[in-house]
Amino acid sequence: MRIIVLGSAAGGGHPQWNCHTPASQRAWQQADGAQRRTQASIAVSADGQRWVLINASPDFRQQILATPALWPQHGLRHSPIESVLLTSGEIDHIAGLLSMRESQRFSLHASSRVLDLLAQNPIFDALNPQYVDRHPFALNTPLTLCDLQLTPFSVPGKVPLFMESRSGGDLAGSNEETLGLTIDDGRHRVHYIPGCAAMTDDLRARLHGAELVFFDGTLWRDDEMVQLGVSQKTGQRMGHMSIDGTDGTLAAFAQLQVARKVLIHINTTNPVLDAHSPEHAAVRAAGWDVAHDGLEISL
């Protein structure tokens, strides 16, 4: 199995277009080797020829330009991307679909909830149904794409930002709002969870002893953006666990015996993005990698 991290940042990327916090300043200046990051998405392949795109980032075109494996290979029109799978209806997971409207054949897979959101917004009709088939999937039921078995499962989260005003106060929404994904090629198994609000017993059992897990790294601490003065929202309010703290990711994974752990979907305010920070040192000491655009893992 081949996995390419196309984007590793949370919504808005790093640096976010209007952000001047310390972490973002370093990225603007590319000081001390600071890396800029696009919004989170990965591509996976069993053979290096046919690829499944996991979430369609607003930075889709930039990510393709940076990834030769996904360039057109033959004919006048071609893409190695044969399927797209969405783990939520968040803007940073669906907006890239609008950059895939040029009459290129691929299959689109999502929960019924997310497909309904797309159907309700006529802008997504730009995806010509003659070329793009939309397929709802069932939770905890494997589907086979490009010789990979992909199993979506529910994790704690919330409704997309643009649906909050229509949620009636139920921000958690249905069990199809926020999903994780298990990817299996018959020899190796990977878990991709770019958004998660809490570690549950079911999730703990699923991840215990895993070979590779990509996990929500949005914020270092729950009140990070509040303390910086850039937002009144906590991580929990946004549907994300924080890395630090007694209920945080480092503590939750401490006994799970995961062979390789990678933080992804990292907010532009998060100090772990600074490779010289004590927070970055702490996650590295706990056995975590911090994803960056272009990271490639072969299993």
UniProtKB/Swiss-Prot annotation:
The keyword Transport applies. InterPro entries: Metallo-B-lactamas (IPR001279), PQQ_synth_PqqB (IPR011842), RibonucZ/Hydroxyglut_hydro (IPR036866). Gene3D superfamilies: Ribonuclease Z/Hydroxyacylglutathione hydrolase-like. GO terms for biological process: pyrroloquinoline quinone biosynthetic process. SUPFAM superfamilies: Metallo-hydrolase/oxidoreductase. Keywords: PQQ biosynthesis, Transport. Pathway: Cofactor biosynthesis; pyrroloquinoline quinone biosynthesis. HAMAP family: PQQ_syn_PqqB (MF_00653). NCBIfam families: PQQ_syn_pqqB. May be involved in the transport of PQQ or its precursor to the periplasm. PANTHER family: COENZYME PQQ SYNTHESIS PROTEIN B, HYDROLASE C777.06C-RELATED-RELATED. Belongs to the PqqB family. This is Coenzyme PQQ synthesis protein B. It comes from Xanthomonas campestris pv. campestris (strain ATCC 33913 / DSM 3586 / NCPPB 528 / LMG 568 / P 25).
